[in-house]
Amino acid sequence: MTAPNRPPARPVGGPPAARMMMGAGGPPEKLQDFKGSTKRLLKMLAPQRALVGLVLLFGVASVFLSVLGPRLLGHATDVIFDGVVGRMLPAGVTKAEAVEGLRRQGNGKVADLLAGMNDVIPGQGIDFDKLLRVLAWVVVVYLFAWVFGVFQGRITARVVQTAVFDLRNQVEAKLSRLPLSYFDKQARGEVLSRATNDTDNIAQTLQQTFAQLITALLTVVGVLGMMFWISPLLALIALVTIPVSFFLTTFIGKRAQPQFVAQWKTTGRLNGHIEEMFTGHSLVKVFGRQHEAEQTFREHNDQLFASSFRAQFISGMIQPAMMFISNVNYVLVAVVGALRVTSGSLSLGEVQAFIQYSRQFSQPLTQVASMANLVQSGVASAERVFALLDAPEQTPDPAPLEMPPVQGRIAFENVSFRYTPDQPLIENLSLAVEPGQTVAIVGPTGAGKTTLVNLLMRFYDVTGGRITLDGVDIATMPREQLREQIGMVLQDTWLFGGTIAENLAYGADDHDEAAIVRAAEAAHVDGFVRMLPEGYETTLDEEGSNVSAGQKQLITIARAFLAEPSILILDEATSSVDTRTEVLIQRAMNTLRTGRTSFVIAHRLSTIRDADLILVMENGSIVEQGTHEELIAAEGAYARLYSAQFAQAVAEVD
């Protein structure tokens, strides 16, 4: 059974230059709920709490060891400095005697510096054994920090990819539950962009920010603790950077958010245009519209360039600003630290460690700030995907019904339907079709012919009245159970990339090679298939370009026959085939329609004159019904339609 294929809506906008000035087709839209979308994005990780806990555990271990490293290096610096100073002092005196001697010589500041050095021994040089032990511990600490970081990265990749894997499954399941009305209102490229590009962007955002944010926050806490341990005064100086960094990040981030939203919306529109032009490239060339298609592409591309440039430029200002703040902090710490060393309040190694910590303290803040563009981009994509997941679904299916074999009696009882509340399309339509009847539905464009079939298939649900199958309201039947009884052939043929046999068997669960061949013979597919080098194993490309339009139509008809439905729906099934092929199809149809209720929406004389009942629709209502001869004799709407559309065809046949 094939599904309806509707053209996507096409975006409309003003001149490209004007749109570029505005960002992306107008003022950029802000994220509707940044906090809510962020929380929902993080909740995707909830099913993997244990692994998230391991990420946190390895992060704590890695950060703890990384924070311990500068302290050990500071101790190594003290060992070296103590040895250098000790060698300059006379041997045979104590440190206290050396300090007192310096004070007597008027070198009070040097004496204060020496007094603050704990392990200096006058006359003794660098203790290399002690230095090597300290450096060995440094190597061990950084080695294990790296190992824990590797484990954290591996588990993070598992957590993120599993979450995105589940998200893709949710999107796929959601698409199957959405009503046809959703796809009527959305460009196919836009839906594809949400299901692919936006999902991939979410994966990239989580992969590049999740563990890094955890590590950055832990690093800030750990480094801050070590800084206060070494010198509360210098720690307070370093703390000044936090509110300044937060203010700058927030200020810049708020201005980048709307641009990221515009970037991903424009990406969806661009994908929609590309998909539309690719699927219809033959018609674009036939009507000489390549220039217009290229112009539209350039307009969308200009919009995407403008919004992407603004988003990246604005968000990219964060990192230089953070580097400036970090450098100012570095200068302040170095100056104040040097003064503290000369006063003997701190050792040189402690100041050296503190300077390293100030860099370590600024680095995660800079990382968090620079990740703001990734986070905003990811949340913008998440909001688009969540909008898809939150779209109203079709009404839930009831439990399967126990039904006797379907006879095929269809009744429309006072059916009303409207696509939008203020635009009624069908009002109080009543119709009874007996089993085995062939009903032709004709009428001008927009009369409601296809809508009638969509209601029968439950692509849409009626807004008033009911439709019954063998006396059972189809609204009480699961859609799958209903559609199993219906074979449908559309005017727009749909074939997927696969063999001819696989395409024929698409609508049937249980089938064998003999059944496929019988259906192909009935639809006159077998003849041309056996002329192909690989026969039924011939691989069709996605567009089926290696078979003709008429052959594609025959394959879709054979597919419906293989499903052995009780009801046939032919939506202009022969409008794209030549006269000879149409005659072959009609001969097969006359046999295959036996015992099946058939609905035919067509403008070809051959599908109308032989129908048991012809319905003439105008403005959603049946204005006439009867056989071909009866309606011609009535000289009403059908006769006028016949004269306008079919008289020439009759003359050609006669």
Segments predicted by a language model, with ranges:
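Membrane-integrated ABC transporters
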Residues: 1-69, 73, 79-138, 152-156, ...
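Short intracellular "coupling" helices and adjacent cytoplasmic loop segments at the cytosolic face
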Residues: 22-29, 81-85, 161, 169-193, ...
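Alpha-helical membrane-protein architecture signal
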Residues: 34-38, 42, 53-54, 168, ...
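An intracellular "coupling" helix at the cytosolic face of ABC transporter transmembrane type-1 domains
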Residues: 47, 180-181, 197-206, 210, ...
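Transmembrane helices of ABC transporter permease
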Residues: 51-64, 208-263, 332-346, 363
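Hydrophobic alpha-helical membrane-associated segments
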Residues: 61-65, 69, 139, 143-160, ...
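Helix-loop-helix
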Residues: 226-240, 310-383, 388-389
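ABC-type nucleotide-binding domain
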Residues: 397-398, 403-654
